[in-house]
């Protein structure tokens, strides 16, 4: 599954935020919660998208969200706190995508 968190960056802080992400990509990967694989941070460009950035993580199952909640690695927590210094106060909007081959579809029965 692909978990995508969308959020905005405070005015005048985008270059600083991008440097923070680039400088800490390795640490984000190495200190991530069990089951979480960092896929990167992407910027919405040319007016496409209602947010400034999207942060993408690959996970295997819903239990990985519990691992995220319970993760207490000091480096991870510090990175999360530092990253939040760049973001605006409105809630981040997240999307969870599942591969087509791993998606279960339920459809109503056809009426006679």
PLM feature spans:
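Short, flexible turn/loop "capping" segments at secondary-structure junctions
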Residues: 1, 46-49
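Active-site-flanking beta-strand signature of metal-NTP-handling nucleotidyl enzymes
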Residues: 1-8, 54
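Short amphipathic
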Residues: 4-6, 93-100
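Short, surface-exposed ligand-recognition loops at beta-strand->loop->(often short) alpha-helix junctions
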Residues: 9-19
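Short, solvent-exposed aromatic-acidic interface loops
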Residues: 10, 44-47
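A short, structured loop/turn motif at beta-sheet edges
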Residues: 14, 60-62, 101-102
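An amphipathic, aromatic/His-enriched active-site/gating alpha helix that lines ligand/cofactor pockets
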Residues: 23-40, 48, 56-97
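Acidic/histidine-enriched, glycine/proline-rich intrinsically disordered or flexible terminal extensions
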Residues: 97-112
């Amino acid at each position: 599954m692909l978990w995508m968190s969308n959020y905005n960056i405070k005015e005048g802080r985008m270059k600083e935020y991008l440097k923070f992400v680039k400088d800490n990509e390795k640490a984000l990967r190495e200190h991530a919660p069990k089951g979480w694989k960092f896929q990167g941070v992407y910027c919405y460009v040319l007016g496409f998208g209602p947010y400034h950035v999207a942060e993408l993580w690959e996970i295997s199952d819903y239990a990985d969200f519990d691992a995220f909640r319970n993760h207490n690695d000091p480096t991870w927590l510090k990175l999360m706190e530092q990253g939040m210094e760049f973001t605006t106060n409105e809630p981040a909007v997240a999307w969870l995508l599942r591969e087509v081959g791993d998606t279960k579809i339920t459809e109503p029965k056809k009426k006679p």
